[in-house]
Structure formats: C-alpha cells, structure tokens
C-alpha cells in the first residue's frame, strides 16, 4: 500500500518532474522526444511563465532572464515557449501591464473622491514613465488614459 503524501510534497514532486522534463527538452535532440511530450511540457511551462508574469509584471526591470531563473530553464527556452504560443515575453508582459492599468483607471474614475494619479498607475504597473505608458495605452486601447478615466469605455478595445 502506498502512503498518502501531503499536498506540499506532491506539488514539489510535480515541480521537480516538470523541471527535469524542461531540462531534458533543452539538452536532448527534440526529434527523439514524442511530440505529445514536448507539447505538454510547453503548455505547462507556458502556464508557469504566465503565472510568473502575473505576479511580477509591476517590476519595471522584469526580463526573460528573471523568469528563466525562477523556473530553472534557459532564457532561450522562455522565448521558444512564448513563440510556440504565438506571442513573445515582451508582448505578454505589456498586455498584462496594460490590462491592470486599465482596470485601475476604470476603478479610480475622476468622479471618485480621490482618484489615483495616472502617473502612479503607470509606475505601479511597471512602466518607467508616464509618457511611455500613455503612448502604449493609446496604441492598445485606442484612447488615452485620461480619456478612459473620463468614461470612454465605449471606445475601448475589449480583451
């Protein structure tokens, strides 16, 4: 009879197996590995990378190397996983930052008693300057952060 393991032991075991599979994919000839295995590992790694980005997107210095170190994979593999999923590390990071900024702008309207300054929203979402944030926000949503705050939801891109 197999003794039952607590959830933390199972989680660590799962993480170790995934780490070993990722390492195997990086060091072996991919032609030797069944496609279903590489796809499954890529999907799990993408989920882990997405979770990492969701937690750390506010860091203005966040780079693929940080995610790679955290997941114990190479930066090259990080780029490859995002490419397989039709995006890039930078594009996904920008999307997360802009979505959070949009949420904050909508929840802190001009009509509220103390709206959060747009610059503060930009910096809290990982942007290094308010002007860069405003340019990227307008490219993505088709309106400026100020227009959004004034109630321009009818113009906004829906995610």
Model-predicted segments: where are they?
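DNA-recognition helix of C2H2 zinc fingers
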Residues: 134
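Alpha-helical bundle regulatory/interaction domains
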Residues: 1-75, 82-90, 96, 103-131, ...
């Amino acid at each position: 009879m197999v003794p039952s393991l607590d959830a933390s032991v199972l989680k660590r075991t799962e993480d170790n197996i995934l780490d070993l599979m990722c390492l195997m994919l990086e060091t072996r000839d991919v032609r030797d590995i069944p496609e279903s295995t590489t796809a499954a590992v890529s999907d799990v790694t993408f989920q882990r990378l997405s979770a990492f980005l969701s937690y750390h997107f506010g860091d203005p210095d966040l780079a693929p190397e940080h995610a790679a170190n955290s997941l114990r994979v190479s930066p090259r593999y990080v780029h490859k996983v995002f490419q397989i999923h039709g995006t890039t590390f930078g594009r996904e990071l920008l999307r997360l930052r802009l979505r959070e900024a949009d949420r904050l702008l909508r929840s802190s309207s001009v009509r509220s008693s103390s709206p959060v300054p747009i610059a503060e929203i930009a910096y809290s979402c990982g942007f290094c300057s308010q002007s860069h944030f405003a340019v990227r926000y307008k490219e993505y949503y088709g309106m400026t952060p100020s227009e959004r705050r004034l109630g321009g939801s009818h113009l906004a891109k829906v995610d």
